[in-house]
């Protein structure tokens, strides 16, 4: 839980800006945030909201971000913040099907421009 001024907020309820701020300040780690979000996803798996989710890759990226942050090497405004991408944005090495049988086995070799920009800002 995190203090947001007038009440306690569950970590998974934090917005992107607040999450990024807390990571920059050191009051929240990328791993803590990623674990909270992954726990929430698992708790509601019956929704089947995720076409593809690589938990190990998310946690490894969060650990890398935390290590960089400790060295003062934050990457950008979204450093260490996990983001979800709709299954229509090409992401290199990750199945991107657009929920279509036509693209059932599509694994792009490069990222969409929006994904490139998110990664450049430090998003996981």
Where are these regions (language model features)?
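Short, well-ordered beta-strand elements within core beta-sheets of diverse protein domains
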Residues: 19-25, 84, 103-107
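Cytochrome P450 core scaffold surrounding the K-helix E-X-X-R motif
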Residues: 44-48, 91-101
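Flexible, acidic active-site loops/lids enriched in D/E/S/T/G that coordinate Mg2+ and/or position polar
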Residues: 55-78, 85, 104-109, 118
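A glycine-rich phosphate/pyrophosphate-binding beta-strand-loop-alpha-helix module
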Residues: 113-124
């Amino acid at each position: 839980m995190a203090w947001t001024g007038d009440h306690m907020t569950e970590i998974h309820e934090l917005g992107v800006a607040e999450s990024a701020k807390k990571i920059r300040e050191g009051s929240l780690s990328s791993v803590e945030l990623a674990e909270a979000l992954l726990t929430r996803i698992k708790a509601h798996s019956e929704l089947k909201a995720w076409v593809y989710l690589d938990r190990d890759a998310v946690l490894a990226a969060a650990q890398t971000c935390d290590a960089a942050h400790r060295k003062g090497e934050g990457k950008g405004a979204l450093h260490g913040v996990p983001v979800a991408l709709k299954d229509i944005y090409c992401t290199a090495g990750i199945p991107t099907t657009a929920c279509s049988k036509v693209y059932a086995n599509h694994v792009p070799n490069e990222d969409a421009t929006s994904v490139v920009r998110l990664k450049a800002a430090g998003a996981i």
